[in-house]
Amino acid sequence: MDLPRLYVPATLANLGSGFDALGVALDLYLEVEAHPAPEDAFLYEGEGHVEGTDNLIHEGYRAGMRALGLEPFPLRVRAFNPIPLARGMGSSSAALVAGVALADRLSGGRLGREGVFRVAAGLEGHPDNVAPAVFGGFVAALSDPPLAIPLPRPEGVRFVLAVPPYEVPTPLAREALPREVPLEDAIYNLARSALWPAALSSGKLEALREACRDRLHQPHRAPLMPGVLEAIEGALEAGALAAFVGGAGPTLAALARAGEEAPVIRALSAYRGPEGRTLVLGIGEGYFWKET
């Protein structure tokens, strides 16, 4: 049987202070078409180059089927991916969520959205990209136990993304982190991560300027992304409500009020570089299906 087309959003993890705990979906979507076939097949268009049936969509599909106690049957998958690869915008999470969502759909919804989150988070290892890809908007998430809670979604805001032309592989970014951190730095981040749900719930978005600040990961990864800390400060000085590295980077994300993006775009142009690109995106929905 042919399935409706599946859409899974790009995501930003960490939001500065909420390392491995907070994330947000963007309105830029991986598109997937799939149907049972005599043998596995994978057709890919879009960012980067991905081929073969040993891909993350098929991996997520197989994991979802096995979580249901079902033997995966061959699946022909066609994917169009506009999400930049290895740039900190959740391309891997989108693919894994897509695969698990396919298994859920083909099983008649036996996993449910919560089950899709649990299986995909188990594969990804970090829930802060998976949770917004599943539930949309801003989300707070844990991996052990697997738990995700959507946060209020502000109106009238947009993300300005400065996407440099180079990649920062997640394993390399993880290696840059210290094994231990000072207690005062942990407290610094804990206090500011609590500001995210407080500011979103109260509508006091000016507090996000402080909520996005971080001492646990961005300063340690900065040598992998030349000029990133200065660019964050430049975006805030240009009027951004918040600015932070997306996931492991190198994408720098700045949240701005709609209509006030232009000075933020200018402030981030040097960091993006002449071969990079700027994206302006709204807050995205969790994965959804649409008849073609």
From Swiss-Prot:
Q: Name one GO cellular component term.
A: cytoplasm
Q: Which GO terms describe its molecular function?
A: ATP binding; homoserine kinase activity
Q: What is this enzyme's EC?
A: 2.7.1.39
Q: Which Pfam families match?
A: GHMP_kinases_C (PF08544), GHMP_kinases_N (PF00288)
Q: Where is it located?
A: Cytoplasm
Pathway it belongs to?
Amino-acid biosynthesis; L-threonine biosynthesis; L-threonine from L-aspartate: step 4/5
Broad class of the protein's primary localization:
cytoplasm
Q: Which PROSITE patterns match?
A: GHMP_KINASES_ATP (PS00627)
Q: Which residues bind ATP?
A: P84, L85, A86, R87, G88, M89, G90, S91, S92, S93, A94
A Gene Ontology BP annotation from the UniProt entry: threonine biosynthetic process
- The top EC class is transferase
Keywords (alphabetical) are:
Amino-acid biosynthesis, ATP-binding, Cytoplasm, Kinase, Nucleotide-binding, Threonine biosynthesis, Transferase
Reactions performed catalytically = L-homoserine + ATP = O-phospho-L-homoserine + ADP + H(+)
Which family does the UniProt entry place this protein in?
Belongs to the GHMP kinase family. Homoserine kinase subfamily.
The family database entries (NCBIfam families) matched by this protein are listed as: thrB
Q: What does this protein do?
A: Catalyzes the ATP-dependent phosphorylation of L-homoserine to L-homoserine phosphate.
Its name, as the record gives it, is: Homoserine kinase
| Species assigned in the record | Thermus thermophilus (strain ATCC BAA-163 / DSM 7039 / HB27)
